[in-house]
Amino acid sequence: PLAVGGSGVFDLPLAFAGYGITAPKQEYDDYEPLGKRVASKAVLVLRQEPQKDNPHSVFNGNQATQHAALVRKIANASEHEAGAVVFCNDASATEPDALMDFRRAGGGENGRSMPVLQVSRSVVTDVIKQATGSSVAALEAEIDRTLEPQSQLLDGWRLRGEVTIQRQQTDAENI
């Protein structure tokens, strides 16, 4: 899990939500193909943003925009009523199966109740292949090529588990 998320027991249907971005200015929305069907689902979300290495990308060339930020992706999933977020490294990661530090997306100060998790790319590769017949790399490449979301429900797949995050409040003096 990541510290930014909440605690709890969950058993949720799974959906692939691409990069987890809703960007009206760029006319791009990973959640549009899912519509209301994303409510109460666990969404698999790639890190970064489409066309990350393309200097002509609508997402500010090869410079990251606000849409690449983990906290923005989590907020967007919440706005679409997702039940959990599961991050996976994108194709450009130097270590595709490396996991982020527990506090990478923040310490949970926002009070989100939904779990925020991460899994290795190899796990997502297997899930996507079995659920769709395609590969996560092929879906990413199609998004990058066409700037069209490839989001879809992963029929028959569920995310089950329990996350317990204990938060401790500490009093400190302001010097």
What are the roles of these predicted feature ranges?
Residues 66:
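Acidic, glycine/polar-enriched metal-coordinating patches/loops
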